[in-house]
Amino acid sequence: MARSIWKGPFVDGYLLKKAEAARASTRSEVIKIWSRRSTILPQFVGLTFGVYNGHKHVPVSVTEDMIGHKFGEFSPTRTFHGHAADKKARRG
């Protein structure tokens, strides 16, 4: 179920402050965040965030298509190593 429109999008407060500080500075550095639950807002377009996936910070460059999505959607937490091969078919 989607979030109520009257509540507005959820964004951690510290994230807005970090984004404003990054916009003010001319350096383009990765902003490390742990808030996978925060919604991507239009103010974040053009910035690069390091979204923590439980192991490392995955760099995510925010584009206009990402607005309204959550940061966690772009930083997978699980690694798929493939299914095991069928040993009976290989035996010959």
UniProtKB/Swiss-Prot annotation:
It holds the Pfam family Ribosomal_S19. The keyword Transferase does not apply. GO terms for biological process: ribosomal small subunit assembly; translation. InterPro entries: Ribosomal_uS19, Ribosomal_uS19_bac-type, Ribosomal_uS19_CS, Ribosomal_uS19_SF. Gene3D superfamilies: 30s Ribosomal Protein S19, Chain A (3.30.860.10). The lineage of its organism: Bacteria, Pseudomonadati, Pseudomonadota, Alphaproteobacteria, Hyphomicrobiales. GO terms for molecular function: rRNA binding; structural constituent of ribosome. This is Small ribosomal subunit protein uS19. Protein S19 forms a complex with S13 that binds strongly to the 16S ribosomal RNA. Keywords: Ribonucleoprotein, Ribosomal protein, RNA-binding, rRNA-binding. It comes from Beijerinckia indica subsp. indica (strain ATCC 9039 / DSM 1715 / NCIMB 8712). GO terms for cellular component: cytoplasm; small ribosomal subunit. It comes from the Bacteria. The keyword Ribonucleoprotein applies. Belongs to the universal ribosomal protein uS19 family.
